[in-house]
Amino acid sequence: MIAYVDASVLLRIALRQADALSEWRQIEQGVASALITTESLRTLDRLRLRAKLPDTEVASRRAKILELIASLELAEIDSVVLDRAAQPMPTEVGTLDAIHLATALLWREQMRQDITLATHDTALSIAARAHGFHVVGAAPT
């Protein structure tokens, strides 16, 4: 399976959280926005401060995040992505989710291949389904 992966999926795996994506091992080619690096590392830093994680735990989780990101094809956030993300959407979508969705839409158009969208985010999954994506990770709406 070719899948666009957002930070919610990557973080549940890297942080060993409950309900990690069961389809993760089925992803043969993972695609993500370069935004995934910033989102993932900022989340880890917030967790470090809130949960007072020991340095060894932070280092281990950071290494896992970077390992997972290295396995993905990262799409840069350029003016084309930002312009697409700024366009009206069929459902309510926040700024970061709009960037993820625009990246997935542009990848699908440019590669002319189907791509599954992997997310645990409800709003992103609804918007992705409205754009004709098969979605894994989020409960059907």
Model-derived regions: residue spans:
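A short glycine/serine-rich beta->alpha loop
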Residues: Q26-G30, Q87-V93
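Alpha-helix capping/helix-boundary segments
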Residues: L10, I36, V81, H100, ...
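Short beta-strand scaffold positions
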Residues: V5, A32, E76, T95-A98, ...
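Short glycine/serine- and small hydrophobic-enriched flexible loop segments
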Residues: R42-L49, L105-L106
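Anionic, Ser/Thr-rich low-complexity intrinsically disordered regions
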Residues: S22, A32, D45-R48, D55-E57, ...
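Short, well-structured N-terminal submotif of metal-dependent ribonuclease cores
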Residues: M1-T37, L47-S60, A139-T141
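Acidic catalytic patch
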Residues: E67-T91, A98-T103
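Acidic, PIN/NYN-like endoribonuclease modules and their adjacent C-terminal/linker elements
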Residues: I2, S33, L106-T141
